Amino acid sequence: MNPNFLQTPIEYLKGVGPNRADLLKKELGIFTFQDLLNLFPNRYLDRTQYYKIKDLQRNSADVQVIGRITHLKTVDQKRGKRLVATFKDANGMMELIWFRGHKWIKENLKLNETYVAFGKTNFYNGTFSMPHPDLELLKEHQSKLRSALQPIYPSTEKLSNSGITNRVVSGLMEQLFLELKKSFVETLSPGILEELQLMPKSKAILNIHFPENGEELAKAIYRLKFEELFFIQLQLLIKNLVHKSKIKGYPFTTIGTNFNSFYKEHLPFDLTGAQKRVIKEIRNDLGSNAQMNRLLQGDVGSGKTIVALLSMLIAIDNGFQACLMAPTEILSVQHYSGLSELCKPLKISISILTGSTKTSIRREIHESLENGQLNILIGTHALLEDKVKFKNLGLAIIDEQHRFGVAQRSKLWHKNKYPPHILVMTATPIPRTLAMSVYGDLDISVIDELPPGRKDIKTVHRYDSNRLKVFKFIKDQTDLGRQVYIVYPLIQESEVLDYKDLMDGHESISREFPQPKYQISIVHGKMKPADKEFEMNRFIKGETQIMVATTVIEVGVNVPNASVMVIESAERFGLSQLHQLRGRVGRGAEQSYCILMTSHKLSADAKTRLETMTGTSDGFEIAEVDLKLRGPGDMMGTQQSGVLNLRIADIVKDTHILKIARSYARQTLEKDPSLILPKNSAIKNTYGQIAKYRNIWNYIS
């Protein structure tokens, strides 16, 4: 088949024309024959099943009813008119309704003939109705029926109201297959097809739109899901291979004095098995000739900072400098304080550069950075300024990288003749399947165990009616010298309301915890950055016992004495947010607590979130539940939505297929990195089509 044929504009398909083409483009994004072919059904209806009118349920999904049209009438309404048909079977009566196209419908309907009506039903004033049904004479319906399974395609209200019903879309699909004539080019290798017993491409495409039976349909769906996920994984793995072959890195071959001295004599605690494994992975990367491009995932408190420091010591022992970039000044200061303390026994020079660094100190930093006297620089995006020049930057560590734009991150690459090694750290657990799909081009390390002896944070759910008991608990904790966070939600759509909630809460807390015995900080989004910083620092220094805040409490803020986190209206937070907020406590030796406050009125999803939070403290387990509740697009945000814009596979439901697809993509490239073997010619050709059309599904044929 000529692949260009499928790029034919959709208006040239028989039965479409310019008006329908405009609607298909606007409503479903169908511009070409290819796009229509890739409009996969949402589900399938068993066309051998018919309902009696008396057995219909309110607001049912698509159903089929056999009956006769006995009467037609036009009814006036506020805007225009509607056409109503009385539709009867042996046991009951319902209405068929059209809001447009009355003249054509009236002329073509035959009273007292037997029809099959197909569509969604509504129930109003004691009567069932079906708006804009698909209607077909029973005798025609029976003669046409090739398969018991009728595909139900994605649609919109505008399409249905304009007469582009499911039957019309099915008809267009039939017409397209008539014009295609020839079979589809195979996209997978014979070996993969044989080993996994996958259905051939031509048969899979035919069965997805015109299923022979349930068994063949299941095979077709599996085949196409595997194909989609296989080529996504292949793309990501090739990107990684190309990166490693083209972008050379400085080989750090020496494990020298600083690393050995710190590791053997000055480690403040024994490393966990996970930390040791991750350090080994990083050492292997740094020792190769390729630039490291690694994502380090670790739950709150898992010990990423010590791994970051050991990585920087390897760079320093090899005569290079290192930097660590954090998204906020407070986090930068905390990293600086922690790393300075750890580096005291070593002869290492370390500085911090942020937006508030004085000009005179800035000049000193710039100078010592350029002449190589400064070993480690920590800071905010101030590190990206053109004036910041390193003598030989060998390792750049980015904390919470999702807070930085791509352009900002790429600036670090150009701080040296060759790009430095890159280590990206995140405390936001990403489910394994999602990480494979979104960050599949990075090497991924996971610290999946917490240091021994760390006490689990006790998490409880309390209703608003128990508030006085919660206040009593807070008083008991502050009397013991502990500090407390009280956090309110901030949802942009109701920012004014949320601000009022926060201020009302602050007022009632101030009454309950009066001065001078209690000192309270308040932080919210409407404050100036300097004021916010001032209040946060008062709490960090222990000058206030209670911090009342919206969700602006930064990831990574470390106040070891804070042992209680109260989250107000917890049902309004996502699981990831709840877990991150809980991670603000439990940093010290004392037992910590997280109290989730809610009203009694809770949705099913909210109950699941609260049960998950009280049931586990494992960030990866929580992330898996979050993925199931929210879906991948919402979880990762719009920035990654392109990677996750899947046509037929579902990352949440098809994890087993994703793992198999990645395994086969990896095996294929290990044996044939350039895809030059004859057995991989189909894969190579398909991969070339992906590059040409920049779309996973534009290679389908």
Which role does the model predict for each range below?
Residues 1-14, 26, 232:
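Long, highly charged, low-complexity intrinsically disordered interaction regions
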Residues 22-23, 249-296:
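Conserved pre-motif I regulatory segment
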Residues 39-66:
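OB-fold nucleic-acid-binding modules
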Residues 277-280, 291-611, 671, 701:
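Inter-lobe coupling/hinge segments of SF2-like helicase ATPases
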